[in-house]
Curated annotation (Swiss-Prot):
Chief localization: mitochondrion
Residues the record lists as binding substrate: R104, R110, N142, R176
The protein's name: Malate dehydrogenase, mitochondrial
Listed CDD domains: MDH_glyoxysomal_mitochondrial
Organism from which the protein derives: Mus musculus
Length: 338
């Protein structure tokens, strides 16, 4: 059942460039001038699914918006600069994507970003709760394992929390898993789908290779190496960029893929499945990423973990303590805010 549904969204990204799709989504990008924000905004501007694109940052947004506005696609683009302009950026939005925050540098974990990015995410999501409480909120800012609990607690404080509308974007883990499996097996990566569950950092990233479509088999040593590469792929890019940033282009692609899937589902397309880090009852963690069936109102049905191998069970068991700690850290941050 799941594998039949779960041929997600490489197709959504391709379809988003066709002109037959409905063009009505009002999308805001918060952190639009950054390394992820600029290429993400370009991909969104290029899609006929988007009718209005509002860009926010604390620097350079008028320039980014002016540049993008010259592209011959239908989305109307406007830039907003600084906190006093944020409410206008958010009004009437259907989807808000938040890549804002500082990137990783060599030697840093995603968790090292916590102190800076926690404040940024709490501030931006408070504005969302006030000015577009009904919008879908897609969090890219790391550490996602903590920034999603932060977002949820902020929305609860404002009395507008809806767990079906807040998503931690883990799509890059799926994109990487698909790519690496395809490389090893000589397959077309656009036709490979590996569900990745758990969280979005290190060993909390759990690729379910046993559920890959098409079915693939690896010897245990190769499976362990492949899993490790998927888990540490972000660090691979940070090292390769040698201090010049983290994964920006692939993250922008993955973020756009998730947004297009979400908008497709909001437009009434059926059978749209993406993995995302959301409030969950699938494990003892209050948030957990699994394949989700998306619908007109966001998360329609959590499709759960499904049948897994002992190797995958062990990875889940090992990830849960770290995930619980990251979730608590995010929740405590909001509870202790002045």
């Amino acid at each position: 059942m799941l594998s039949a549904l779960a041929r997600p969204a490489g197709a959504a990204l391709r379809r988003s460039f066709s002109t037959s799709a409905q063009n009505n989504a009002k999308v805001a990008v918060l952190g639009a001038s950054g390394g992820i924000g600029q290429p993400l905004s370009l991909l969104l501007k290029n899609s006929p699914l988007v009718s209005r694109l509002t860009l926010y940052d604390i620097a350079h947004t008028p320039g980014v918006a002016a540049d993008l506005s010259h592209i011959e696609t239908r989305a109307n683009v406007k830039g907003y600069l600084g906190p006093e302009q944020l409410p206008d950026c958010l009004k009437g939005c259907d989807v808000v994507v938040i890549p804002a925050g500082v990137p990783r540098k060599p030697g840093m974990t995603r968790d090292d970003l916590f102190n800076t990015n926690a404040t940024i995410v709490a501030t931006l999501t408070a504005a969302c709760a006030q000015h577009c409480p009904e919008a879908m909120v897609c969090i890219i800012a790391n550490p996602v394992n903590s920034t999603i609990p932060i977002t949820a607690e902020v929305f609860k404080k404002h009395g507008v929390y809806n767990p079906n509308k807040i998503f931690g974007v883990t799509t890059l883990d799926i994109v990487r898993a698909n790519t690496f499996v395809a490389e090893l097996k000589g397959l077309d990566p656009a036709r490979v789908n590996v569900p990745v569950i758990g969280g979005h950092a290190g060993k909390t990233i759990i690729p379910l290779i046993s559920q890959c479509t098409p079915k693939v088999d690896f010897p245990q040593d190769q499976l362990a190496t492949l899993t490790g590469r998927i888990q540490e792929a972000g660090t691979e890019v940070v090292k390769a960029k040698a201090g010049a940033g983290s994964a920006t282009l692939s993250m922008a692609y993955a973020g756009a893929r998730f947004v297009f899937s979400l908008v497709d589902a909001m437009n009434g397309k059926e059978g749209v499945v993406e993995c995302s880090f959301v409030q969950s009852k699938e494990t003892e963690c209050t948030y957990f990423s699994t394949p989700l069936l998306l619908g007109k109102k966001g998360l329609e049905k959590n499709l759960g973990i499904g049948k897994i191998t002992p190797f995958e069970e062990k990875m889940i068991a090992e990830a849960i303590p770290e995930l619980k700690a990251s979730i608590k850290k995010g929740e405590d941050f909001v509870k202790n805010m002045k």
